[in-house]
Amino acid sequence: MSKRDYYEVLGVARGASDEELKKAYRRCAMKHHPDRNPGDAAAEAAFKECKEAYEVLSDGNKRRAYDAHGHAAFEHGMGGGGGGPGSPDMGDIFGDIFGNIFGGGAAGPRAARRGADVGYVLELDLEEAVAGIERRIEIPTLIECVSCHGSGSEDGKVQTCGTCHGRGQVRIQRGIFAMQQSCPHCDGRGTLIQNPCKTCHGAGRVEENKVLSIKVPAGVDTGDRIRLAGEGEAGPAGTPPGDLYVEVRVREHAIFQRDGDDLHCEVPIRISQAALGDTVRVATLGGEAEIRIPAETQTGKLFRLRGKGVRSVRSRSEGDLYCRVVVETPVNLTADQRELLQQFEATFTGEDARKHSPKSATFIDGVKGFWDRMTS
């Protein structure tokens, strides 16, 4: 019996794109999959025909050979007995197309799990976070066993698992669907170790403290994460390692509070400075700066110093420094100072008090009005 044209099998034109081929194969395979047609020999044969056609047409070299010579291109050396050219494994093609629907993705040792990711909290002072720093850290982790180079075998020899036949996964029937899961016999490796390594006892990994140097970019803030690819735990049986995620945590500062790329601080000034005005020096992360306090400044007034905040780790623009003035009440007064203040206070009488302390007068008037309403 002659074979059907592969394009006809998938129902596509000869100029079909790779994406069109994949969609056509998906439709064909879904329709004829044995799990949907249990005991149907015709459906099983059609399913194999779909796989065979897709294996050829999805491979550029095979497709060119087929377009030039038809089925004759595979009559010598590519047969492979009843399964068509190359006899594709369902895990190679069908699993790649359908993911978890029928096979859980690409099967076998190729899909073996990677090493676990590792987290580390790095505490920094505000100055370190703003300027950037290189810091050495030590983390407990699993590294590849140097004795067996991660194989877990003392002599380097491994045996193919008889349960999963080296694929690392086994099929589990769930109604009309067949699911795949990690082989419980070989733990998903696809191989078994007859002579375990004496150092790692067959695990291929050993516990050890790893010392790393981390370059922290300038401008990081609490919650930012730095990813170091491949610096997590070593993968089992030589699979790729996980990643290391360093989470930044910035300690509280004695002077500054951070809000994004802006900084805030309080600047205490004396009553005389607030009343008469003055120029005061304030601390910034880059040194000192001056702010001019105008006469009659009240507590809470904000002064903005542009560009004196934090340089953004993302945009590289600079934030600002906001200085909030706090008028400080004098303490530990001498007798002379107390007398001077008493003389000063004596000048606040009548309308002069309302003129020189308008907020106090407004507050007193408000309290008086409240009690008048309560007692009326």
Curated annotation (Swiss-Prot):
Q: Where does this polypeptide localize?
A: Cytoplasm
Major subcellular site: cytoplasm
Q: Which GO terms describe its molecular function?
A: ATP binding; heat shock protein binding; unfolded protein binding; zinc ion binding
GO CC, one annotated term = cytoplasm
**Obligatory cofactor(s):** Zn(2+)
The cross-references to PROSITE patterns, in alphabetical order and at most eight, read:
DNAJ_2, ZF_CR
Chain ranges of the J domain: 5-70
Q: Does the keyword Chaperone apply?
A: yes
Q: How is the cofactor bound?
A: Binds 2 Zn(2+) ions per monomer.
Which residues form the CR-type zinc fingers? 132-209
Extent of the CXXCXGXG motif repeats: 145-152, 161-168, 183-190, 197-204
Q: Which residues bind Zn(2+) 2?
A: C161, C164, C183, C186
Cited function: Participates actively in the response to hyperosmotic and heat shock by preventing the aggregation of stress-denatured proteins and by disaggregating proteins, also in an autonomous, DnaK-independent fashion. Unfolded proteins bind initially to DnaJ; upon interaction with the DnaJ-bound protein, DnaK hydrolyzes its bound ATP, resulting in the formation of a stable complex. GrpE releases ADP from DnaK; ATP binding to DnaK triggers the release of the substrate protein, thus completing the reaction cycle.
**The record's note on its domains:** The J domain is necessary and sufficient to stimulate DnaK ATPase activity. Zinc center 1 plays an important role in the autonomous, DnaK-independent chaperone activity of DnaJ. Zinc center 2 is essential for interaction with DnaK and for DnaJ activity.
Question: Which family is this protein grouped under?
Answer: Belongs to the DnaJ family.
NCBIfam families on file: DnaJ_bact, PRK10767.1
Question: What protein name applies here?
Answer: Chaperone protein DnaJ
UniProt organism field: Xanthomonas oryzae pv. oryzae (strain KACC10331 / KXO85)
Gene giving rise to this polypeptide:
dnaJ
